[in-house]
Amino acid sequence: MSDLGESPSSSPPAPPADTAPPPETPSENSALPPVDSSPPSPPADSSSTPPLSEPSTPPPDSQLPPLPSILPPLTDSPPPPSDSSPPVDSTPSPPPPTSNESPSPPEDSETPPAPPNESNDNNPPPSQDLQSPPPSSPSPNVGPTNPESPPLQSPPAPPASDPTNSPPASPLDPTNPPPIQPSGPATSPPANPNAPPSPFPTVPPKTPSSGPVVSPSLTSPSKGTPTPNQGNGDGGGGGGGYQGKTMVGMAVAGFAIMALIGVVFLVRRKKKRNIDSYNHSQYLPHPNFSVKSDGFLYGQDPGKGYSSGPNGSMYNNSQQQQSSMGNSYGTAGGGYPHHQMQSSGTPDSAILGSGQTHFSYEELAEITQGFARKNILGEGGFGCVYKGTLQDGKVVAVKQLKAGSGQGDREFKAEVEIISRVHHRHLVSLVGYCISDQHRLLIYEYVSNQTLEHHLHGKGLPVLEWSKRVRIAIGSAKGLAYLHEDCHPKIIHRDIKSANILLDDEYEAQVADFGLARLNDTTQTHVSTRVMGTFGYLAPEYASSGKLTDRSDVFSFGVVLLELVTGRKPVDQTQPLGEESLVEWARPLLLKAIETGDLSELIDTRLEKRYVEHEVFRMIETAAACVRHSGPKRPRMVQVVRALDCDGDSGDISNGIKIGQSTTYDSGQYNEDIMKFRKMAFGGDNSVESGLYSGNYSAKSSSDFSGNESETRPFNNRRF
């Protein structure tokens, strides 16, 4: 202990020894490790070392206060005194290299260790040394021993006891932060003693640059890190582990976000698909029902009798003396659906034509003179047709649906939607419409020359010339072809007959009665809840099953062609038994005329040979193809138009099938089907509206078609 006291006192005279200690330190450092392990050896060396460190320290006494001030916080971990020695080892080497690298910093680094030594010298009692070691994390006993052991390890060890440990450790931290930050407290005494000379001399040059940084290195000892090697490994591993965890967390978060986005996308796509499928499915027709069935098919009023169309182109017995013009106007309609017209007010005039399209109920009452009975053109099961004159002088036909008729409302909606899309010179034109409370009215162009039925079968009228018959046939065929081919979706008329073919003054045909027309969506067939049509014009498959195609219209048009050729009615009660049906009577004669060219048995005798034979023959051939029992084997209306409206070869209207060689036609079965249809539709012997042949050929003026029995009697007789 006396030696320890002397060492501080002797330290002042040893300034010249500053040059010597650096070389001595490496040699002594090699022996240091064993000395560090054994505390007794340091005291012996301490006598020589203090003078070495002291000469350099005395000048920077002023720096002493700040260093001890920094040390107290570091006293948290005094237990590792032996650890402090390695930092001390690092301090001895710094002086020489620092002096070489940067004069000022090395001096600073050298000076700080000296003040503690001076403090130790000024305070011979080891208590101050004990205080200084705790910050440096050496044990209090090592304080005095450090002056001895550092000389063995390195002369400046005592000055670096605590303050020196902090400056060198701190410089080491900035230079090599990862290794030294945890190892700053010098938990590496064993490792450092093993190889202090070479690493530490190299480290000191780095220390001067970062010499001022003391707290970081000191903070590490406070953490009580183990050996410096372990500290270095922990520091690097800690940083790497933190970064690794961060990367893993980011990867997991990114994967979770991507998975969430994918799930959301799939869910939305599935919902959209379900919505799309629902939207499409709600417009698909029921296998036994049609999309627009409510708008086109309506129940009949037994009291009113059977009507060929929802608008009543056929009239009841009380109105049979009315002109057949009312029949044609009774069912033609147009415009927009009811809900669209209410929301938009009036439809586009481009669709309905120029001029006024929407009329008030008061306006229509005025133009029809208060819907006077004298202006009635006809009356059907669902309303009356009135003749009226607009303010501009244009004559129109106004159809008024019966108030409170739900069927009439549906009919109105169907008609206005269909006719609003149809514009053709051979189709009846829509002028406007009216919606007022419960009133639903449609305004059509007035066709002045009545109907084909009127001109063919009216008594007291001149015989319809053959040229006019050909013109009517071609015009009506073009109108139907437009409905079937040029309307999208196609429109099936469903009630083609001579009473629904209007004639203008030039005998140009205009097809009317779209009340029974139905939009044929994408399917080729529709099954109706009720079969509507006129006996004598119904296709066999339609009458029996309600199956509807455009070929059903072709069959009905074939019956009209037979009317034009023969001048006979579709059903004639005055004819011999088995010949009441025009189609049944004409089938064998058609085959014979085509095979032999003999037209005498088919042609209307009233024409008195005033016809063109090849035109008659062409019309006969076309009619025979149209009335085939097999629907698919009938021609399309486009083919019919080409066959009728060409002067040369009309092509193969028969589709390669000779007349009479199609599916065998059982007229008895057809009659049975018609009877079943009558019972299904009307439930008994309710009279059918006989306005079918209105005008001069009403039930009251002719025994022909006086009622339901007149049309069905041939079928009843046929069954027996």
From Swiss-Prot:
Please tell me one Gene Ontology term that the record gives under cellular component. plasma membrane
Q: Which domain of life is it from?
A: Eukaryota
Side of membrane Extracellular, spans:
1-246
| Glycan attachment residues as annotated in the record | N117
Q: What GO terms describe the biological role, i.e. biological process, of this protein? A: developmental process
The reaction(s) catalysed by this protein are:
L-seryl-[protein] + ATP = O-phospho-L-seryl-[protein] + ADP + H(+); L-threonyl-[protein] + ATP = O-phospho-L-threonyl-[protein] + ADP + H(+)
The similarity comment for this entry is: Belongs to the protein kinase superfamily. Ser/Thr protein kinase family.
Protein name according to UniProt: Proline-rich receptor-like protein kinase PERK12
Question: Its principal location?
Answer: membrane
Q: Which residues cross the membrane?
A: 247-267
What are the record keywords, sorted? ATP-binding, Cell membrane, Glycoprotein, Kinase, Membrane, Nucleotide-binding, Phosphoprotein, Serine/threonine-protein kinase, Transferase, Transmembrane, Transmembrane helix
Expressed in which tissues: Mostly expressed in apical parts, including flower buds, and particularly in anthers. Also present in root hairs.
Any idea which residues bear Phosphothreonine here?
T529, T534
Amino acid composition bias (Pro residues), ranges on this chain: 10-25, 52-84, 92-116, 123-138, 147-207
GO MF terms on file?
ATP binding; protein serine kinase activity; protein serine/threonine kinase activity
Q: Where does ATP bind?
A: L377, G378, E379, G380, G381, F382, G383, C384, V385, K399
| Its membrane topology | Single-pass membrane protein
Active site (catalytic residues) = D495 (proton acceptor)
**Cellular localization per UniProt:** Cell membrane
Q: Which residues carry this modification: Phosphoserine?
A: S528
Described function? Regulates the auxin-related MAX (More Axillary Growth) pathway during the shoot branching.
Q: Which organism is it from?
A: Arabidopsis thaliana
> Which SMART domains does the entry link to?
S_TKc (SM00220)
Q: What is its EC number?
A: 2.7.11.1
Give the Low complexity compositional bias ranges: 26-35, 311-330
